[in-house]
Swiss-Prot record:
Matches recorded under Pfam families: Penaeidin (PF05927)
Role according to the record: Antibacterial and antifungal activity. Presents chitin-binding activity.
Protein family per UniProt: Belongs to the penaeidin family.
InterPro entries, per the entry: Penaeidin
Species the sequence originates in: Penaeus vannamei
Highest taxon of the lineage: Eukaryota
Primary localization: cytoplasm
Protein name in UniProt: Penaeidin-3h
Subcellular location: Cytoplasmic granule
Keywords noted in UniProt: Amidation, Antibiotic, Antimicrobial, Chitin-binding, Disulfide bond, Fungicide, Pyrrolidone carboxylic acid, Signal
Pyrrolidone carboxylic acid modifications at: Q20
One GO term (biological process): killing of cells of another organism
């Protein structure tokens, strides 16, 4: 019996770690933050806004700042949108 309880616990823990479990009994998945990528150092600068055109080389907080202040958000493999 203890073995079954232990295996069930480990399986549920693995699902939580993989983000495949639903929280609170709802049928929606646990939200994950959007993936931000880093711009290349010394990369091109967008006109009139000071934002790098590439999304590589910037920190997560810089990417969030660009998104909130300037309406330009980094997306993996797509550069900025907005």
């Amino acid at each position: 019996m203890r073995l079954v309880v232990c295996l069930v616990f480990l399986a549920s823990f693995a699902l939580v770690c993989q983000g495949q479990v639903y929280k609170g009994g709802y049928t929606r998945p646990i939200p994950r933050p959007p993936p931000f990528v880093r711009p290349l150092p010394g990369g091109p600068i967008g006109p009139y806004n000071g934002c790098p055109i590439s999304c590589r080389g910037i920190s997560f907080s810089q990417a969030r700042s660009y998104c909130s202040r300037l309406g330009r958000c980094c997306h993996v493999g797509k550069g900025y949108s907005g």
